[in-house]
Amino acid sequence: MIMIFFGCMNLYSVSPEKAEKQLIWILLSFFFIFIIFLFKPIHYKHITPFLFLFTLFLLIGVFFFGKNVNGSKSWYVFGSISFQPSELAKISTSLMIAHIMSQENIENNNKALLHISIILVLPSFLILLQPDPGSSIVFSSFLLTLYREGLSISFILYFLFYILLFVVSINLSPWIVILLLFISFIFFFFLKKNISFLDLFFYIFLFISFSVFSFFSPFVFQKFFKQHHKDRINILFQNEFDRKYRDNVGYNLLYSKTAIGSGKFFGKGYQKGTVTKGKFVPEQHTDYIFCTVGEEWGFIGSVILIIFYLLFISRIYFLSERQKNIFGRIFGYSVGNILFIHLIINLGMVMGLFPTIGIVLPFFSYGGSSLWSFTVLLFIFIRIDASDQTSLI
């Protein structure tokens, strides 16, 4: 509630009209909370497969009936009401992961790991095709949930390395990257003693797969990424203050950093932000809402907000760990990890550490779909954590 209240305050500073609409979304979210508490936790487990299939149906249908917004065909629009099925996908996938993993242990179980992989790949791939890479990246948060349940840390490290390799390969010659990989592997062999034949075969396979991935990364980037996605990634390696970039692809990042930096230690004061008040930062009510915090509340206000988020997420992890049933624990960790990934990527976006990929700040940014999605995620978990004696159904 503190974050929602603080978010409304900052929205009002940016746009009073948006703040009034957000207040309506907040009031309507209490309806979802009421519905959630009508049901026993076991009911959510029973409807999970049907909800997941319904979500896939919506994600496929958006290609035919969806509206193109900001280059992505990811919204259903019904008059003045719009709905993004990728938000529902976060809920249904969290439930489905918990449903499957409460029945199958993924530790040393390739069959269970395959089932989980299919569940994760289907919605994230459909969302990526829209194309909405930001929402698709959020699904990587489930790797943290899988790690808690026994997934080897190697899988996560490989995933992160492939992302790093992709970014490096589109900015350097793939041949240079392959040469660096080769030198690294040779250096590793000299350090490691008594390598078995199977280990040698595995490392050679890794080198070949990394090399092939690096070689084709620039081709994939140029052919399959839309221009605005390429611009948002490329600007991370350029100087946004350069005249060549500051008036186009670097505009968002330039004024985002300017707004945050101008707040200094204590901020300019509520509703006294010159950059945000001047509406220099595009989407400052959604993706870039943190700029308002940095400018008006300064370093102190920004740190306090981040601490609130971390305490909030830590509390979710604590409640997840104390769950007596596996379903509740896994779902709780999924909720916490989704919020954590949103927080990290959103803060990284406004500070130029990540490309702008449309990731909102949970319970803070403007938007009904995202607010309702986070509300439903959180309160289903709260309902699972609470006693089921108060259920009406």
Residue ranges and their predicted role:
Residues I2-F5, M9-N248, G294-M351, V376, ...:
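Hydrophobic alpha-helical transmembrane segments of multi-pass inner membrane proteins, especially
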Residues F83, Y255, F363-F364:
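Short hydrophobic beta-strand that contains or immediately precedes a catalytic carboxylate
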Residues N346-I393:
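A juxtamembrane structural motif centered on a specific transmembrane helix
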Residues C291, S302, Y333-S334, P362, ...:
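Pore-lining and gate-forming transmembrane alpha-helices of multi-pass membrane transport proteins
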